[in-house]
Amino acid sequence: MGSDAPTDVITDTSTLVNFLRIGRVDLLAGLTSYRFVVTDHVRYEVTSYYPTQLSSFEFALLAGHVVEITLDTPADLTVFAELKALRLGDGECAYIAGALNRGLPLAIDDTRARKEAVARNPSLRLLDTVGLMVEAIQAGLLTVAEADVIKVDWETNHRFIKKHFLSFAELIR
């Protein structure tokens, strides 16, 4: 692959669902330096816990905005089991195993899961919903004002709590 090839990013359910819920997977697709990769655990979690997002998820897969993989190698299963013993959820275990075993960045918001991932590989690159929104603003995919409206919607309707900043303007450099 050439230097312009996008970087695969293992993406957890919560990060993806944040964009699915507002109908803005186009923001992820517009971040052309990344290719968002989800595990089959994401499909299970979207189907089981976010059924209203299932059609948007399936469209994102068909459109190539996200790519699905199955974690079934011995290395994946070993890391999964080790993390499961720490009482992480199946999804978190899968995302972390996928990122660690493939040397890929991980887009995940869960604080405890992020700590476990970095404990296993301190150089693991972590992304999150807020950082992806900042990159989308910097790429001209939306304005700060539009991002702030989305932030309020997430905080009000979607268990997204990022009170450490009032506006994305504070995060733009």
Annotate each language-model stretch with its function.
Residues G2-G98, R102-L104, T111-E116, R120, ...:
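Active-site-proximal, substrate-binding regions of enzyme catalytic domains
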Residues R125-L142:
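Long, charge-dense
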